[in-house]
């Protein structure tokens, strides 16, 4: 893929932090290293209409997005972790995209199930395409921007993403890490509801969201079936060994672990309070207190 063209008429683009590599690189490397130039070059070659068609097929709302090359980098596309989890589930599910949902069932006070979510899925690509994408995205966690995100003793495929702030390219407004196994998709976003000069992230995804994602995935994955991928890592297929030394400083790890420990502790306190509320039969009053506690946790 083209990894050197930085200007298309009035549109200018560069790789994150101005990273320079070879003028042309294989697709698996472009994905693993989350490079902007190859993505824009691909949309330029295939056409913006194809990019919009793909976005809509994977459940993204493209109605208010400008039809410009920046769409290759997600420019103007509003999304959220749930939508991203649904989209990436198609790769984990061999081309079938399930409908993401929060509520699986609703029970009344007697425990009777009064409503159940009906699972549905649609094919958005064939199995061969999904397998090729997974093969390439396995490299994200072994040789690319997701090395710091890679959970110990587990194999994941996926993608990272970073958005620079408009007022300082050294700061970021959004950090994404999305990883999946054949059993589960974990979609993680780090940022502020509104980014300004008082609210921004001072690190890149590999030094920020990555460490939180790793801790989250190492907590979740032991409770999954542990299915393994049937495709090989594209780096391995091309004779390249994994760069399995994590990009993580002890300070970054201790800060992240401390944050997660604090969240887990507060969450457990909330659960304990909910249990006491039920046992004391003061449901309404106690439930409000518990809810207020949850809200305070995220303020």
Model regions: which residues?
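Hydrophobic residues at beta-strand termini and immediately following loops
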Residues: 1, 73, 188
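Conserved catalytic neighborhood of penicillin-recognizing serine enzymes
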Residues: 1-51, 68, 97, 109-134, ...
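Mid-domain, small-residue-enriched loop/turn segments at the edges of structured enzyme/sensor domains
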Residues: 12-20, 47-86
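A penicillin-recognizing enzyme superfamily signal
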Residues: 29, 79-86, 90-245
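Short secondary-structure junctions and interdomain/linker hinges
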Residues: 34-38, 49-50, 58, 62, ...
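Hydrophobic alpha-helix position signal
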Residues: 43, 54-55, 91
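Periplasmic/cell-envelope proteins involved in peptidoglycan metabolism and beta-lactam response
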Residues: 53-55, 292-299
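Composition-driven recognition of long, low-complexity, acid-poor segments enriched in small hydrophobic
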Residues: 216, 249-294
């Amino acid at each position: 893929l083209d990894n050197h063209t930085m200007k298309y008429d009035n549109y200018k683009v560069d790789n994150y932090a101005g990273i320079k590599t070879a003028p042309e690189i294989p697709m698996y490397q472009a994905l693993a290293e989350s490079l902007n130039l190859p993505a824009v070059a691909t949309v330029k070659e295939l056409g913006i209409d194809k990019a919009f068609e793909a976005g809509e097929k994977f459940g993204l709302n493209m109605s208010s997005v400008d039809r410009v090359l920046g769409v290759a980098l997600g420019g103007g596309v509003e999304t959220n972790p749930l939508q991203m989890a649904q989209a990436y589930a198609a790769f984990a599910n061999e081309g079938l995209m399930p409908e993401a949902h929060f509520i699986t069932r609703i029970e009344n006070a007697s425990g009777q199930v009064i409503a159940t979510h009906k699972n549905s899925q649609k094919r958005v690509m064939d199995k061969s395409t999904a397998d090729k994408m997974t093969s390439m995205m396995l490299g994200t966690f072994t040789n690319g921007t997701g090395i710091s995100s890679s959970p110990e003793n587990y194999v994941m495929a996926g993608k990272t993403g970073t958005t620079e702030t408009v007022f300082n390219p050294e700061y970021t407004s959004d950090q994404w890490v999305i990883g999946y196994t054949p059993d589960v998709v974990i979609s993680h976003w780090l940022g502020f509801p509104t980014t300004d000069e008082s609210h921004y992230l001072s690190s890149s995804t590999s030094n920020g969201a990555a460490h939180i994602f790793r801790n989250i995935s190492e907590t979740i994955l032991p409770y999954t079936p542990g299915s393994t991928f049937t495709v090989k890592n594209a780096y391995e297929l091309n004779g390249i060994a994994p760069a399995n030394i994590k990009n993580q400083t002890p300070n970054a790890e201790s800060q992240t672990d401390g944050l997660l420990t604090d969240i887990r502790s507060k969450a457990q306190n909330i659960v304990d309070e909910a249990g006491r509320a039920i046992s004391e039969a003061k449901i309404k009053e106690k439930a409000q207190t518990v809810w207020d506690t949850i809200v305070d946790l995220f303020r």
